[in-house]
A protein has these predicted regions:
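Hydrophobic anchor at the beta1->P-loop junction of P-loop NTPases
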Residues: 14
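Small-molecule kinase domains that catalyze NTP-dependent phosphoryl transfer to phosphate-bearing small molecules
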Residues: 115-118, 123-173, 181-186
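ATP-dependent NMP and nucleoside kinases share a basic, alpha-helical "lid"
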Residues: 51, 57, 74-133
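Conserved substrate/cofactor phosphate-moiety recognition/catalytic segment
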Residues: 27-75
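Short acidic, low-complexity intrinsically disordered linear motifs used
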Residues: 195-211
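Extreme N-terminal, non-catalytic leader segments
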Residues: 1-11
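The conserved Walker
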Residues: 18
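Conserved lysine of the Walker
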Residues: 22
């Protein structure tokens, strides 16, 4: 296994209310990781649901099945040294824990809680789903007629509040955390050296008076 492959066995799982900003922040993280030379797949939870298992509804049990199926895909990707990003509401702690246990059989799992007050989410909602849910048009809608079990400090790995920070600021906080975890300590796709090696080389060149 080469240095680049060694850093592909992880999953970033974004959880939060509808319209909290999960997908927006996840996309920013994906772009940064791709630029760092990491092979990664950004799995759209809605697309997976509609294409792989359109028969599923939105009861607690069906949401759990959906989460487990996505988790299994992440597990397979991680097994093959492909990192994965998932932005899914994942409202129930029980199934978030199931997904963690499943993925950690092959890789590292990071739960990222994208926090945002429901009133702010409603104002952001571009499709008017909250309004339709409040009118009874959409049943089992998280944040209205279905609960969201907020992740605790013991459960999530990092949290960002999109009502207080911009998407870019949220992404940078997450990236700082991933740097601390060594996730961004990857092989550069052109030079084949790690960030720490690059810093060491620059320091030596500075000591020698070249920089």
């Amino acid at each position: 296994m080469n240095e680049k492959e060694r850093f592909g066995n992880f999953t970033l799982w974004f959880t939060g209310l509808p319209s909290s900003g999960k997908s927006t922040v996840a996309k920013l993280i994906e772009n940064e990781l791709l630029d760092s030379g990491i092979t990664i797949e950004n799995l759209d939870a809605d697309d997976l649901r509609s294409n792989l298992h359109p028969d599923l509804g939105f009861t607690k049990e069906e949401r759990g099945i959906n989460n487990r199926r996505i988790g299994y895909i992440c597990k397979l990707l991680n097994k093959n040294n492909v990192a994965s990003i998932v932005a899914a509401i994942s409202p129930f702690r029980e199934y978030r824990n199931v997904v963690r246990e499943l993925i950690e059989q092959e890789g590292r799992f990071y739960l990222i809680y994208v926090k945002c007050p429901v009133e702010v989410c409603k104002k952001r909602d571009p499709k008017g789903l909250y309004e339709k849910a409040e009118q009874g048009i959409i049943p089992n809608f998280t944040g209205v007629s279905h609960p969201f079990e907020e992740p605790t400090e013991e459960e999530y790995d990092i949290t960002v509040d999109t009502s207080k920070l911009s998407p870019d600021q949220c992404a940078e906080e997450i990236l700082d955390y991933l740097r601390d975890e060594g996730i961004l300590e990857t092989v550069d796709k052109y030079t084949g050296i790690t960030e720490s090696e690059e810093k060491e080389i620059k320091k030596k060149l500075q000591d020698m008076g070249y920089l």
